[in-house]
């Protein structure tokens, strides 16, 4: 299957290829990831994703993809009188801030929405890069709530697994071109005032992240193919597990609100 802008996110493409997002899903909750692929579960995406997609399109999309996005999402972005909703207005201001930053625009000046495919441990992967400059860099645009991590023991790059994204993108580009390129994040926040940053993920972290992908991707593929039963994560922030849970017995009050990892640690399973 030849991937294009039109079919990149199609059910067939998602069935044939892993993406970084799909890998993250299987690592977080295999049952949720499997249900999404089979069509049994459709994740609800709020305005955060819509706004992120809007900023991404306006800064790295093609003219054709921008017009398509605006047409499909016009009523969610703009009021009946044509004025943008408040959060969209803030996103527009952020886009202008980014365009006035030479360093940010340097890393957003490559070829946009470049698709490549490859394999990791024999498993097909697909990537679509926000900004790719042959022989120089790979860059991805992020529109974040802020640059602080929800986890005190991880920085925001590690928390959101951007290292996995950088590692996979760099490896697939290497397979296609023979070049190992640096990976950058071009970051703008939703804060007032907006915080801006250009971040390079270092080689050590990218290599470590690629090792993580290599160690886990075959199991993820086996789950995807139905060869291994997909486990439920039962984490509090997993909408799929919350919506499909069947209670079997009371739990101890000390366990209420704890993460699965915390409960396993208490039981000595970790």
Predicted regions and their residues:
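Hydrophobic/aromatic-lined pockets within catalytic cores
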Residues: 59-63, 143-146, 174, 221
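Metal-dependent nuclease catalytic cores that hydrolyze phosphodiester bonds in DNA/RNA
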Residues: 1-128, 233, 237, 248-260
């Amino acid at each position: 299957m030849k991937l294009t802008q039109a079919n990149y996110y199609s059910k067939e493409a998602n069935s044939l290829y892993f993406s970084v997002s799909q890998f993250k899903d299987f690592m977080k909750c295999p049952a949720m990831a499997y249900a999404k692929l089979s069509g049994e579960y459709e994740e609800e995406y709020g305005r955060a994703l819509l706004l992120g997609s809007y900023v991404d399109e306006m800064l790295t999309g093609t003219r054709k993809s921008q017009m398509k996005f605006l047409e499909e999402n016009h009523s969610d972005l703009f009021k009946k009188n044509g004025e943008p909703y408040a959060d969209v207005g803030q996103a527009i201001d952020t886009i202008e801030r980014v365009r006035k930053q030479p360093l940010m625009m340097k890393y957003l000046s490559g070829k946009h929405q470049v698709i490549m495919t490859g394999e990791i441990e024999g498993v097909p992967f697909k990537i679509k890069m926000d900004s790719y400059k042959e022989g120089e860099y790979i860059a991805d645009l992020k529109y974040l709530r802020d640059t602080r991590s929800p986890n005190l023991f991880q920085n925001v790059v590690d928390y959101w697994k951007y290292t996995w994204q950088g590692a996979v993108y760099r490896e697939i580009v290497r397979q296609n071109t023979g070049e190992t390129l640096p990976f950058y994040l071009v970051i703008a926040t939703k804060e007032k005032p907006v915080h801006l940053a250009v971040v390079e993920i270092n080689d050590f972290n990218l290599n470590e992240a690629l090792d993580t992908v290599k160690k886990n991707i075959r199991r993820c593929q086996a789950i995807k193919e139905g060869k291994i039963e997909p486990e439920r994560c039962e984490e509090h922030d997993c909408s799929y597990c919350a919506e499909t849970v069947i209670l079997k017995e009371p739990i101890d009050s000390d366990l209420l609100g704890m993460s699965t990892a915390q409960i396993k640690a208490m039981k000595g399973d970790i």
